[in-house]
Amino acid sequence: MENTTPLRKQYLDIKKNYPEAIVFFRLGDFYETFEEDARIAARELEIVLTSREMGKGLKVPLAGIPYHALDNYLSRLINKGYKVAICEQVTKPGETKGLVQRQVTRLVTPGTVVEPNLLQTKQNNFLLSLYLTEDSCGLAFADISTSEFGCTQTNIGELEAEISRLSPAEIILPKNQSLNLPIHLKATISKLDGYYFEADIAREHLLRHFECQNLSAYGCENMPLAISAAGALLNYLEETQKSSLKQLERLSVYTTADYMQMDSHTLSNLEIFRSSGGNSLKGSLLGILDQTRTAMGGRLLRKFLGQPLLKQSDIEKRLSAVDYFFEESLARTSLAKSLGQIADMERMANRIRQKTILPRELISLKNSLETVSAIHRQFGLMPPPRLAYFLNGLKPLPEMLDIINKTITDDPPSTLGDGKVIRAGFDPEMDKLCSLAGDARTFLSQMETRERERTGIKSLKLGYNRVFGYYIEISNANLGDMPPEFIRKQTLVNAERFITPELKEYENLILNAKERLLEMETGLYEQVLNQLGGFYSALLANAAALAALDVLSAFAEVAVRNSYVRPVFHPENRLDIRKGRHPMVEQGLGYGSFVANDISLSAEDCQIIILTGPNMAGKSTYLKQTALIVLMAQIGSYVPAETAELCLTDRIFTRIGAREDLSAGQSTFMVEMVETASILNTATSRSLLILDEIGRGTSTYDGLAIAQAVVEYIHSQPSLTAKTLFATHYHELVELASYLPRVKNYNIAVSEDRGEVVFLHKIVPGGVDKSYGIHVAKLAGLPKWVIKRAYEVLTELENPAKKQPKSRTCQPQLQLPMTGQTSVLEEEIKELEIESLTPLAALNKLYELKKKAEEQGL
């Protein structure tokens, strides 16, 4: 360290406190990175890697970015999961002896971003904190850009569903704990010392933050794990933000039982937030329903989809509001136009509180507040009864508007310092400084004209740069006419630059005025933000009301465009959907092309539907559309059907498709069985089960046996009786309906004509005993030879008696037992009571006997 420069010592002292972050070290007009940070920055940001001498014989890797381009480069690093420590100069050159003082003013991580251009407008940016035990979990989340702060305590089995629903950008855990993330989720994992998760420490942190004596008012006193997670989250935010967290003024405590539950597989299988094919918004349910016009509405829609309601009265309130907008097309159209002019008031309110909002954004806020007044005149003065519940927070804020109008210019720049942010007349002293700066500019223009005339040098010009200040520039060709009082300041290739005593005097005057102007404008702007901060709660209330109106009117717009209907809820444990449709598939096919289907499920008479039929005929679509209609109804949306009579569903489970969990060392079949076990162990009589091809991941007989046992279990367990759609390629399962009274068979209708097969996509009663797999293979484009040979093999398998061996070179003969001898196998066959066997049991017995015969060499 003896040969290290003071600047490097300063950097190393700061860097040691942020070993996991890239340190952006402010040096004048640049943020510099050093050593390994520089190598990472150069690689990820595609900037030049150079070096700087920072001690005797010591050259250190260096890569820098201009300070004004920070947000652009910052977003690229954060999106790749890096953390960045912003180290600023906190004193001015000359104010202190030696180096300018520097300190980290903020640690930017994926879960603590607040800059508008780094955030997804219609998606929350959640930081998630977890504290795990063997069978339970404390969970807390916060979005500091919107002031949301919540927590819960749940069993470990429901954790993955909550993580998928929240889709956090960053997760914090104690150092001694680990977590397997859902396969689709890309979140940064940050580790905290376990000390911050200790119950007493975390509780004290929360009490201090909320300035209260206990947590009973928040409803989490009996959630020790949730308290641990929430307290640790607060600590992490304080460490990263280096500022007050006053915007987190409420803690929303909830339980997963408050809402319909869907695990991560269900969210993925039903394509709620993203399509399975392109992993994008297009093709998802969110993509269909999101006709929202505001950022707040878009985020609220995501919340609705992740937490369908279980309280019928709350659902009916939403449906009644959708009714209003469905019927009142002029009101819906007018509102949509107004909402399109509303900025992200929720995030703006928080940036006002944090004093990070830009002057130009205040004009956008002003325009939004004017639109709020117009919307209030339309709906708030005489609220339509069906909207009244959602209009409570909608109130004009004329005082806030007045403050912005009186203090901020109509077209302010993004930054402070030029005297163009604060409106003239607001502060007399600042007006004087602005006038002085303006007069100086006029003086310099006049001086340039005067010096040209005095010297006769027509090309003479006055200029300014940050290094040399103000100067007079004369080309080399005119240096002979230069007056003697000009003092040389800089030599260029084709010109020389000079100063004069008069110019230097005005330079000092102007620079002092600009410095004072920056200080004064900054101070006045902060005063304005303090005043606007007094409207924080009212601004958030308006944002919440507008978000609700946005989502509910969007539901109506989607319903009108796609001919959806209002669902009806009843207390019986049944659902009855007439001409139901799959919302995403229908849109992909185009209007009128989708084949609608009915479904009736009831705990009393049709609890389980066994659905058979060929692949690609529409089984999965039918299963999924039923679940989607139930979900849509419980978020308060109209549904794609002719009629829909539903009961409240507490959970939707789906077991669809095949996938491996390589990270856990689990095969496709093991994953299938784990998911099936979870469903059977947690479903209730009010659940909806969507089971597709259970048992296909193992041998035919094992799979068939498991599939049958699962159906029998769902049917026979008194505490279960969940409404179930069970699609299968095991045609033998249709026999279950003969002795399980609440099992019904349905199949996909198929038309055959002269060897051509047409899938009608219509669900009809009854089972099928024929597969059309080869036809599907033909549609997929397999070679004609393969298709022809497959039909030959199929014929042989279906008619074994007619099968003729291709070669008869060696035909071993069976050794028949001698007269009077009886084998054990024969005795077992004789003892069979064939009349009491079901077809499926007989098939299983035949398989068993065949296996024994092979073992005996028969």
Curated annotation (Swiss-Prot):
Q: Where does ATP bind?
A: 613-620
Keywords attached to this Swiss-Prot or TrEMBL record, sorted alphabetically, are: ATP-binding, DNA damage, DNA repair, DNA-binding, Nucleotide-binding
Q: InterPro entries under this entry?
A: DNA_mismatch_repair_MutS (IPR005748), DNA_mismatch_repair_MutS-lik_N (IPR007695), DNA_mismatch_repair_MutS/MSH (IPR017261), DNA_mismatch_repair_MutS_C (IPR000432), DNA_mismatch_repair_MutS_clamp (IPR007861), DNA_mismatch_repair_MutS_core (IPR007696), DNA_mismatch_repair_MutS_N (IPR016151), DNA_mismatch_repair_MutS_sf (IPR036187)
* Keyword Nucleotide-binding attached: yes
| Cited SMART domains | MUTSac, MUTSd
Could you confirm whether the keyword Nucleotide-binding appears in this record?
A: yes
This one is known as DNA mismatch repair protein MutS
